[in-house]
């Protein structure tokens, strides 16, 4: 994924946090879908994919399996929301949720969207998060997803690259009361 595509996905996640007036972790992905008018339908079929975003009668719908852990469902829901927000619905049939260098670019973009929506770096930085375990606990995501986010956050810590974008500063300001209450 090139930086321009990464930026687009990241910024889309920040815009959703801002537009939906999200102010605390864990981010309530289902409430965001409801606020955006995107129905989420659950399936209990054990052999069903974890999630899929589709268009029914010209409107986006997210299909979400009930069998994964709540943390995994949260990430899958945010991932599928990313496909919708980024305009992928109808363009992709892949169902991969575990990030991989071989991922389709649309899957990579949806993963970036989901991780930035559920675990915004500026909020984690503001809370002085120092481990994947802390990310998993604060954000309500799986240890695997938290580890990927922690690895990226460590790079940002090394570079000192926080609050550079006006959108990121807006997200930080919106979460400020939460950050102050959860600073470690």
Pin down the residues of each PLM region.
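Active-site hotspot residues in diverse enzymes, especially metal/ion-binding acidic/histidine motifs
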Residues: 1-184
């Amino acid at each position: 994924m090139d930086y321009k595509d990464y930026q687009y996905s990241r910024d889309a996640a920040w815009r959703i946090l801002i537009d939906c007036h999200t102010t605390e972790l864990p981010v309530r992905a289902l409430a965001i879908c409801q606020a955006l008018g995107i129905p989420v339908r659950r399936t209990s079929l054990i052999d069903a994919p974890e999630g899929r975003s589709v268009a029914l009668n010209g409107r986006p719908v997210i299909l979400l399996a009930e069998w994964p852990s709540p943390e995994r469902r949260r990430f899958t829901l945010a991932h599928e929301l990313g496909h919708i927000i980024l305009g992928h619905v109808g363009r992709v049939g892949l169902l991969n949720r575990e990030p991989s260098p071989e991922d389709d670019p649309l899957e990579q973009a949806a993963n970036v969207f989901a991780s930035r929506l559920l675990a915004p770096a500026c909020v984690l930085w503001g809370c002085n998060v120092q481990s994947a375990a802390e990310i998993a606990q604060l954000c309500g995501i799986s240890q695997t997803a938290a580890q990927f986010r922690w690895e990226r956050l460590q790079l940002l810590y090394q570079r000192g690259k926080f609050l550079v974008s006006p959108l990121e500063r807006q997200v930080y300001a919106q979460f400020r009361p939460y950050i102050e209450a959860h600073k470690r």
